[in-house]
């Protein structure tokens, strides 16, 4: 990272993805904030589209730009499933991440969709129990989950074959 900039920051991990993204966004200085995960890929053609989009921002002034996020691939590794995700956000007080797991920014103001694809190319399995552990910690701390968190908690319980817990 230091080969590109001297602006490299350290965030002490605390099982909260929204806190990590909000920390990163707090360091942004431009009119817009763009994010990627370490295992996201932007192909060359998509990079050209991003540069074209960058030139249009001053004229269109969107608050949130939703880009395609590929998360499923066919047998030839070509993207086969995607959804739109907030990727480029106007730097303002409304660009706030929520959710310790499966974090998101609630869309605000002028929202546009662009035909630009980011590919999620997960490397390795990581900690298969991480999300479940965080959800259970949230329940111990708060006693309840938001409807969105309940949905993802149910999925984690299902993935861990805790079907009765997932159904309740």
Regions found by a protein language model. Give the residues of each.
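Acidic donor-binding segment of Leloir-type glycosyltransferases
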Residues: 1-10, 14, 23, 27
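Catalytic-site signature of metal-activated, phosphate-bearing donor transferases
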Residues: 19-25, 42-165
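Catalytic metal- and UDP-sugar-binding loop of GT-A-like glycosyltransferases, i.e.
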Residues: 36-38
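Alpha/beta-hydrolase active-site loop signature
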Residues: 15-16, 40
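Short aromatic/hydrophobic "clamp" motif used to bind/position activated sugar donors
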Residues: 33
């Amino acid at each position: 990272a230091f080969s590109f900039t001297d602006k490299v920051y350290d965030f002490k991990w605390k099982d909260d993805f929204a806190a990590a993204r909000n920390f990163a966004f707090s360091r942004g200085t431009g009119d817009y904030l763009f994010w990627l995960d370490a295992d996201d890929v932007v192909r060359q053609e998509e990079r050209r589209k991003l540069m074209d989009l960058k030139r249009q921002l001053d004229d269109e002034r969107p608050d949130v730009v939703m880009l395609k996020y590929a998360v499923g691939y066919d047998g030839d590794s070509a993207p086969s499933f995607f959804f739109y995700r907030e990727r480029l956000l106007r730097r303002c007080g409304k660009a706030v991440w929520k959710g310790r797991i499966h974090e998101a920014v609630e869309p605000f103001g002028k929202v546009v969709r662009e035909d630009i694809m980011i590919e999620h190319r997960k490397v390795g399995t990581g900690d298969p129990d991480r999300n479940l552990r965080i959800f259970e910690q949230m329940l111990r701390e708060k006693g309840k989950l938001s409807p969105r968190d309940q949905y993802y908690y149910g999925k984690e319980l299902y993935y861990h074959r805790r079907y009765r817990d997932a159904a309740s």
